[in-house]
Amino acid sequence: MKNIFTILTLSITVSLVAQTHEITKHNGIKMEVNFIKTANNLVYYTLPQSAEEKSISQFAISQLQEKSKTEVKTISKKITLSGKADYNKVIVLKPSQTEGLQESGIITSFLGKTKGETNQSFLDEAEKRLKQNAALKGSPFIVIVSNKPKKLKAVMYTYK
């Protein structure tokens, strides 16, 4: 009976150890975690000595390495901006998708709505303007806070 219990305990322990991964962030910091899943631009994990589920934005993570197989999976590539022309590289996130990124400031702008302009074309132009301002300041991520005609506002995020 003791042997069965010992074998069962060892097999459970080995399976838990086999799930250990190493997350490498874009700033070079490495974290040892137990990877759970990726969903909605978030990576869910637990720390090795904890059962509490945590999450981090997939945009903050460079790669995920499975320790048991030495298998490396690229999660995201680092976004580098060289000026206003790179506004297409700026990503609009939801507030919940910014975990692991650092807030770097707030940008505001004014955009007049012309007569006959549709709401969708206005929103597209407003997003483009905010992305251009973020690219000019070197921030690859924004969260749009307000997209009203006289008060465009977004929070900028960069890598920690």
Residue ranges and their predicted role:
Residues M1-E22:
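Bacterial Sec-dependent N-terminal signal peptides
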Residues Q19-F141, V145-P149, V155-K160:
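Compositionally biased alpha-helical segments
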